[in-house]
Amino acid sequence: MTTPSRKPPADPQKFAVAVGPSAIDGHGAFAAEPIPARRKIGEIRGESISVREAWRRARRQARIMIVEVSPRRAVDASRSTDPLRYTNHSCAPNSVLHIRRGRIEIFSMREVAAGEELTIDYGDSHHQGQLACRCGAPRCVGRL
């Protein structure tokens, strides 16, 4: 009897991304190669948890790396090795986050140069206006 072979999970990163010091906040995700406009950069992976557990963890963590993917489920990327988990907020982002079938995908909105920090708009976040925005964009809203 033969054992069926299992394919390793597909690499969720379509473009090379590196982690480095960010002028926005702590660490950031940076394009390690040029990325064309409107292309999938990659995915953020992590532990699938309930939204209730996500809120519990968010209250005790200094750095939140949790994304709600449905009304009941969230992904905690705190222990993930995916560099995109370090994607910071900007009021003038170069990328956008899409949730599709429970997957967290990041797409470029415009051409992104090698070495440029990848940013998304966190939108309605759980910070409830309590976190100062440090993106430095000309039209920064000031708070998350």
PLM feature segments, named:
Residues 1-144:
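Conserved catalytic SET/PR domain of SAM-dependent protein methyltransferases, capturing the structural core
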